[in-house]
From Swiss-Prot:
<keyword id="KW-1003">Cell membrane</keyword>
<dbReference type="Pfam" id="PF14849">
    <property type="entry name" value="YidC_periplas"/>
</dbReference>
<dbReference type="InterPro" id="IPR019998">
    <property type="entry name" value="Membr_insert_YidC"/>
</dbReference>
<protein>
    <recommendedName>
        <fullName>Membrane protein insertase YidC</fullName>
    </recommendedName>
</protein>
<dbReference type="InterPro" id="IPR028053">
    <property type="entry name" value="Membr_insert_YidC_N"/>
</dbReference>
<feature type="transmembrane region" description="Helical">
    <location>
        <begin position="4"/>
        <end position="24"/>
    </location>
</feature>
<feature type="compositionally biased region" description="Low complexity">
    <location>
        <begin position="57"/>
        <end position="76"/>
    </location>
</feature>
<keyword id="KW-1133">Transmembrane helix</keyword>
<keyword id="KW-0997">Cell inner membrane</keyword>
<dbReference type="Pfam" id="PF02096">
    <property type="entry name" value="60KD_IMP"/>
</dbReference>
<feature type="transmembrane region" description="Helical">
    <location>
        <begin position="518"/>
        <end position="538"/>
    </location>
</feature>
<keyword id="KW-0143">Chaperone</keyword>
<keyword id="KW-0653">Protein transport</keyword>
<keyword id="KW-0812">Transmembrane</keyword>
<dbReference type="GO" id="GO:0032977">
    <property type="term" value="F:membrane insertase activity"/>
</dbReference>
<keyword id="KW-0813">Transport</keyword>
<keyword id="KW-0472">Membrane</keyword>
Length: 571
């Protein structure tokens, strides 16, 4: 297989993948499905509380359904609390985070652009995080998500200059003597909001209840297009457990594979979109029952539990973190949560995700040296070219040798005509005699393909590149080139690469396909993020120089056809 043919196959494979990404996505909103409910996880044995018994049965009026129904009516303004830090502005009541703005991430680069709103009360596409308490016993008083009341009169909390932490206290008290104190803690330069619930029972009877934590969203209908980078990324719910690891479900087919009913210890749940995500992270040592469902056209993922039986005179507590923010790799790593790095969704496949994480690590190290994400991309491509040079050299040498012997192969084809068996036998004899490996040009490309595909997703998925400039006219590496300069350069690089690569023996159809390939790629790249096109231009430009050098070094003169018939072994 000569190098031009290998390039043709690889190029059309790339076209097929990109077209598949464009056309395989559904434009319709998710179809509501019946609500599925299930019991919370078995009660936990926690110091200060007696383990309770939770039946493995369907729970009427499960928390997810109740939470959605309750939120259908707007929360009174008197109950709302605003919390502002250096990175977040939250609107919440005791049990819900109703609105969340990411103050360091404007929606556009225009001056005065409002910040990204991750959680929202938009009636068309509401998105909230909910935490409340429920009970198997309908006679047991519980706060739900609405029962918590703010302690004190302050309703606007602001993290002051020099202050590193801010606490917002809530409380719920039952006539039976049960009290739940809820404390929300926000910190400087952190997107994780810490929830701590302390349950105490001063009554005369045991109290049974369990905590639930929910993400509830009506997904936005995305414009599925190569011109819309948001549609490239995974949009849906994900969860993690120590046995089955990372799992996910897209919004567009939320319940296509059934509901989720699973007890998980030390896991987490999340909803992802391009560059941003929300996640509930319960305590590592507590077990919860994870549920995936749809209620009233809204997609929910929920962790129910742990459940507690709190005896008179006893108390217990449970904690969780709510992440509301960007997919910043360094900050996610600081949370020290197993598997949380997978929310930066380079791939659903573990091997590709590991390759993507490694590539981003290298990209980040280069960025620390050069201080610019555009130049970091250039540096990463140079490093990859150096590392992969032995494979590329093998590919070029094999292709050059195949091209040199094309006159001999053409002679064999002419000699044996339609007798393909004799032609193949003679060609194998030629390969063996001249020590030609027909797969030598193909294997290196197959080895490199996972790296190139992983790098594509690194450049698309990394929020660090969002609105990051390169230089000159490129002021946002995640937006398309406004003047199409990089796509035009990419077309020129591909065209010169074709001209530099001899293609003896290629049939007319392949030649026509090759002639159109730079134009096809140019049109597609015109609407891709400029950071991705920058990668293709640098990679192609270095490849062109490498091709020129290798052709000069290993090209040689074509081996002329023989004057005597080549011997063919008889069977």
């Amino acid at each position: 297989m000569n190098q031009t043919r290998v390039f043709l196959i690889f190029a059309w494979l790339m076209v097929a993948v990109l077209l598949w990404m464009e056309w395989s996505r559904e434009k319709a909103a998710p179809t509501p499905a019946p609500t599925t409910t299930s019991a919370p996880a078995a009660a936990q044995s926690v110091p200060g509380a007696t383990p309770g018994s939770v039946p493995n049965a369907q729970v009427p009026g499960a928390p997810g359904q109740a939470a959605v129904q309750a939120q259908a009516s707007a929360t009174p303004a008197s109950q709302r609390v605003t919390v502002t830090t250096d990175v977040l502005r939250l609107v919440l009541d005791g049990g819900r985070v109703l609105d969340a703005e990411l103050l360091q991430f404007p929606q556009t680069k225009d001056e005065g652009s409002p910040p990204v709103r991750l959680l929202t009360e938009d009636p068309a596409h509401p998105y909230s995080a909910i935490s409340g308490w429920a009970s198997e016993d309908k006679n047991t008083p519980v706060p739900g998500a609405d029962g918590f009341k703010l302690v004190g009169d302050t309703k606007d909390f602001v993290l002051a200059k020099g202050q590193n932490e801010l606490q917002i206290p809530f409380v719920w008290t039952a006539d039976s003597g049960v009290t739940i104190k809820r404390t929300l803690t926000v910190s400087r330069n952190e997107y994780a909001v810490r929830f701590k619930d302390e349950v105490s029972n001063t009554g005369a009877a045991p109290w049974n209840g369990y905590v639930y934590r929910t993400l509830d969203r009506t997904p936005t209908i995305l414009s599925r297009s190569m011109t819309n980078p948001d549609s490239f990324s995974f949009n849906g719910a994900t969860w993690y457990d120590n046995d089955k690891k990372y799992q996910r479900r897209a919004f567009k087919d939320y319940l296509e594979d059934g509901t989720l009913n699973q007890n998980i210890t030390g896991g987490w749940l999340a909803m992802l979109q391009h560059h941003f995500f929300t996640a509930w992270i319960p305590q590592k040592d507590q077990t919860a029952h994870y549920v995936l469902s749809q209620v009233a056209g809204r997609d929910l993922i929920e962790a129910r539990g742990p459940a507690f039986t709190v005896a008179p005179g006893q108390s217990t507590s449970t904690e969780a973190r709510l992440w509301v923010g960007p997919k910043l790799v360094n900050l996610i790593a600081k949370e020290d949560v197993p598997g949380l790095d997978r929310v930066v969704d380079y791939s659903r496949f573990s091997m590709m995700a590991v390759i993507g994480q490694g590539l981003f690590w290298v990209l980040n190290q280069v960025h620390k040296l050069v201080g610019n994400w555009g130049w970091a991309i250039v540096g990463l491509v140079v490093l990859l070219k150096l590392v992969l040079y032995p494979l590329s050299a093998t590919q070029y040498k094999s292709g050059a040798k195949m091209r040199r012997f094309q006159p001999r192969i053409a002679q064999l084809k002419e000699r044996y005509g339609d007798d393909r068996q004799k032609f193949q036998t003679a060609m194998m004899e030629l390969y063996k005699k001249e020590k030609i490996n027909p797969m030598g040009g193909c294997l290196p490309i197959l080895i490199q393909m996972p790296i190139f595909f992983a790098l594509y997703w690194v450049l698309v998925e990394s929020v660090e590149l969002r609105q990051a400039p390169w230089f000159g006219w490129i002021q946002d590496l995640t937006a398309r080139d406004p003047y199409f300069i990089l796509p035009v350069i990419n077309v020129a690089v591909m065209w010169f690469t074709q001209k530099l690569t001899p293609a003896p023996g290629m049939d007319p159809m392949q030649q026509k396909m090759m002639q159109f390939m730079p134009l096809v790629f140019g049109v597609m790249m015109a609407f891709m993020p400029s950071g991705l096109v920058l990668y293709w231009v640098v990679n192609g430009g270095l490849g062109l120089l490498q091709q020129w050098w290798m052709t000069k070094r290993h090209g040689g003169e074509p081996v002329p056809a023989t004057t005597a018939p080549a011997p063919v072994k008889k069977k």
